[in-house]
Curated annotation (Swiss-Prot):
The modification Sulfotyrosine is found at residue 3. One of its GO terms (biological process) is innate immune response. This is Fibrinogen beta chain. It comes from the Eukaryota. A long coiled coil structure formed by 3 polypeptide chains connects the central nodule to the C-terminal domains (distal nodules). The long C-terminal ends of the alpha chains fold back, contributing a fourth strand to the coiled coil structure. One of its GO terms (cellular component) is extracellular region. Keywords: Adaptive immunity, Blood coagulation, Coiled coil, Disulfide bond, Hemostasis, Immunity, Innate immunity, Secreted, Sulfation. Heterohexamer; disulfide linked. Contains 2 sets of 3 non-identical chains (alpha, beta and gamma). The 2 heterotrimers are in head to head conformation with the N-termini in a small central domain.
Length: 19
């Protein structure tokens, strides 16, 4: 499971990539 977290426009965007 790949966990990516990046901040954009002052908001926190968390995306999960299933492998």
């Amino acid at each position: 499971l790949d966990y990516d977290h990046e901040e954009e426009d002052g908001r926190t965007k968390v995306t999960f990539d299933a492998r």
